[in-house]
Swiss-Prot record:
Reaction it catalyzes: sartorypyrone F + acetyl-CoA = sartorypyrone G + CoA; sartorypyrone D + acetyl-CoA = sartorypyrone A + CoA
Stated role: Acetyltransferase; part of the gene cluster that mediates the biosynthesis of meroterpenoids called sartorypyrones. SpyB catalyzes the last step of the pathway and is responsible for the acetylation of sartorypyrones D and F to produce sartorypyrones A and G, respectively. The biosynthesis of sartorypyrones begins with the production of triacetic acid lactone (TAL) by the NR-PKS spyA using one molecule of acetyl-CoA and two molecules of malonyl-CoA.
Protein name: Acetyltransferase spyB
Membrane topology: Multi-pass membrane protein
TM helices/strands, residue ranges: 123-143, 168-188, 199-219, 228-248, 309-329, 383-403, 453-473, 481-501, 529-549
InterPro entries: Wax_synthase, Wax_synthase_dom
Primary site of residence: membrane
Gene name tied to this protein: spyB
Length: 591
């Protein structure tokens, strides 16, 4: 049964009526047939997939209670469609009227982003490829139906935005538990050379792959899907580090005091699982470099160790302000009439207008020094409030995530001191293994040093490609690997210039005004000024190519409460500025 017949089978022939009568169901079989005839490829979950791999012949429709519909198939499954929630008639009309647009969008490799009718809450499409057993797909149907029926009464009354976010988080929970708990238990219960440890990698990749198979989530929950995907991917790298190449076991954890002799199994599993979630290794022998110290506001408190109440109050105040800031920034960005036009590479920079250069520079600097920092920091501080508030962690386990912006006067300092170090441990462990163990490069040597740096940024690029796929950006559109590998090139250029300057000048004896950097060395102010200009130029050259696909995805607001809509943009900006000053002078906020 194709969509046209589905609509024509109802008296009015109106797709909106068909939608209201049948409930939220739409079968794009006709579109799939058209794509097959044209010999095109459709992009599923951000990856081009030959249409020949899918079967789309529907044999019957089974009606479940509460308006849930599931389509089943004659033979071993290719795919099934299961949709639930609100599917508005205007979206239904748009889906039918835009069939040709849907087909053309497949040629561009991002059909799932242009077709807004299906999402985690408004409708879920789960595609099961040929080689997946029928039993597995039916179990997935059953679990999905049961879960939706259990929560339908509570969730259906929620606003659409909140419902999408809640459903995404509920869906992610078993994935996160499966990915983090299994390696933690393996470390505690197996020896370093156990065969089970080598089998774990298949399990971890399988869990991540299953997360990739969920539909692209539109609108409010798309970023949450990507964040969960990044966490699942990074556990693979950290597990590769702690389970295989630098293996830990229970005895070593006791010796390093990561776990205690009196800890029960649940507490031990939690402490080991933290090594896969909080990747900076705070207060462990593996603590990464570049972690800022706690702010002076907390260190000057009369209580030692840090007062839990003072920590929670300060974190809550900063989280509230970050929410206000991101809310206003997102609202203003939506009104921007001159977004980045397109990615530019090579000699194309010579043809960029002055106005577009201004846009690119301002966008890049605001992105790195304001918006992205705030977006990452708010998640970290929220997690710290939950962990410290329920007593799982101490305030000392949650030092600031970002360093001071005034230290970002070289690319090395930008990435190693100013920017968060959340992924430094698994990235460097992976790069060290590739450069020193697998390639056996001589150490120390320039070749080993810069190969190692290149691998660190390459792994970072791969991780961000995974995030792009979950955001609906195909691999061909993603510029993540190009952007992050360009940082390795920038570091090489920077090191070469610094080495040349050292040879022609007595730079270790600066004259005039100077400041002291994080390593205790005096740095002339003009060196910092030149360095800041260099960092800004390199970021402005490289960042827009990475941001353009993200900007084109046109994701909706992430915020459950939109402050500018409630009080007006001007009042929201005034509240944000006033709140920022209050946080700065009351809690000694640091930038």
């Amino acid at each position: 049964m194709c969509m046209d017949r589905l609509v024509e089978s109802y008296p009015t022939g109106d797709p909106g009526d068909a939608c209201r009568i049948l409930g939220p169901i739409a079968i794009m079989q006709a579109d799939l047939e058209e794509i097959s005839e044209f010999g095109l490829q459709t992009s599923i979950f951000g990856r081009p997939t030959p249409i020949s791999r899918l079967h789309h012949t529907v044999s019957s429709l089974h009606h479940f209670e509460s308006g849930h519909w599931v389509s089943t198939y004659k033979s071993r499954p290719a795919a099934f469609f299961f949709t639930s929630g609100d599917f508005h008639s205007d979206q239904f009309n748009k889906a039918i009227a835009g069939r040709r647009d849907f087909v053309r969008s497949c040629r561009r490799g991002h059909a799932e982003r242009n077709y807004s009718g299906f999402s985690l809450a408004d409708g879920t499409i789960i595609w099961t490829l040929k080689y997946v057993p029928l039993a597995a797909s039916r179990c997935l149907i059953f679990l999905r139906v049961i879960r939706m029926q259990k929560f339908s009464d509570q969730v259906k009354e929620m606003p659409r935005r909140e419902r999408r976010v809640l459903e995404t988080l509920l869906y992610a929970l078993p994935f996160l538990l499966a990915q983090n708990l299994v390696p933690a238990i393996l470390i505690l219960k197996t020896k370093k050379n156990a065969v089970l440890r080598y089998l774990w990698i298949f399990w971890s990749v399988f869990v991540f792959y299953q997360w990739l198979q969920i539909p692209i989530s539109h609108g409010e929950s798309g970023t949450y899907v990507a964040k969960v995907g990044v966490q699942l991917f990074i556990v693979i790298l950290q597990g590769f580090n702690l389970v295989l190449i630098n293996p830990l076991d229970r005895d070593e954890l006791l010796q390093t005091k990561v776990t205690g002799p009196r800890d029960d199994l649940l507490r031990q599993v939690y402490k080991v699982a933290r090594l896969f979630t909080y990747l900076r290794g705070v207060r462990t022998p593996w603590q990464v470099k570049g972690i800022p110290s706690h702010p002076a506001y907390l260190e000057l408190q009369p209580k030692t160790p840090i007062s839990r109440s003072a920590f929670l109050v300060r974190q809550a105040a900063i989280v509230a302000w970050l929410y206000l800031y991101l809310n206003c920034a997102n609202s203003l960005a939506d009104r921007n009439s001159s977004p980045l036009s397109k990615p530019i590479y090579g000699l194309g920079y010579l043809r960029v207008s002055r106005e577009e250069w201004r846009t690119r520079i301002m966008t890049s600097l605001m992105f790195w020094f304001a918006f992205l920092r705030a977006a990452v920091d708010i998640d970290y501080r929220t997690a710290s409030i939950l962990s410290v508030g329920v007593g799982l962690d101490a305030p000392e386990d949650w030092p600031p995530l970002f360093g001071r912006a005034n230290q970002a006067y070289t690319l090395r300092n930008f990435w190693g001191t100013y920017w968060h170090q959340m992924f430094r441990w698994p990235f460097t462990a992976t790069s060290n293994y590739l450069a020193r163990e697998l390639m056996a490069l001589p150490r120390p040597s320039l070749l080993e040093r810069y190969t190692n740096i290149f691998f660190v940024f390459l792994v970072s690029g791969v991780m961000h490609v995974m995030s792009d796929l979950l955001m609906g950006i195909s691999m061909s559109q993603s510029a993540s690997i190009l952007f992050f590998c360009s940082m390795a090139v920038g570091v090489m250029i920077e090191d070469a210039v610094q080495a040349a300057w050292t040879r022609v000048s007595d730079s270790h004896r600066p004259g005039g005004a100077s400041t002291v950097d994080s390593d205790g060395y005096a740095v002339p102010c003009w060196h910092k000024l030149v360095g800041f200009i260099w960092v800004c130029v390199w970021l402005s050259l490289t960042t827009p190519a990475w941001l353009c696909p993200l900007q084109m995805s046109k994701e909706k607001s992430l915020f459950l409460v939109n402050i500018p809509e409630l009080v007006g943009t001007r009042k929201a900006i005034a509240i944000t500025v006033g709140g920022g000053l209050l946080v700065k002078y009351t809690f000694r906020g640091e930038l």
